[in-house]
């Protein structure tokens, strides 16, 4: 990750001299969660069991989520959702008429039940 200062300087370099950049607020990057940790293996195992056609792999998340607040209680925070969603459903997230199918919801509930049982 990069710091807020580094991000501001990169934007400043891109827009100078046409605009000024002012940081109003923000938070820096969070720690990278290791994939060689038992918690990640539990996610992988439960996912293979409940969502047989899903793949579990690390990825870069370039936006802030509420998960950043969880680092105060646990250093390894994995951002994961066990819901199958169509492109239209993903685009509806945090918008009017946000939705997933009933089947996807129930499958996600089953995934969370198994995760709690494994924890």
Regions found by a protein language model. Give the residues of each.
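Metal-dependent amide/peptide-bond hydrolase catalytic core
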Residues: 1-113, 117-119
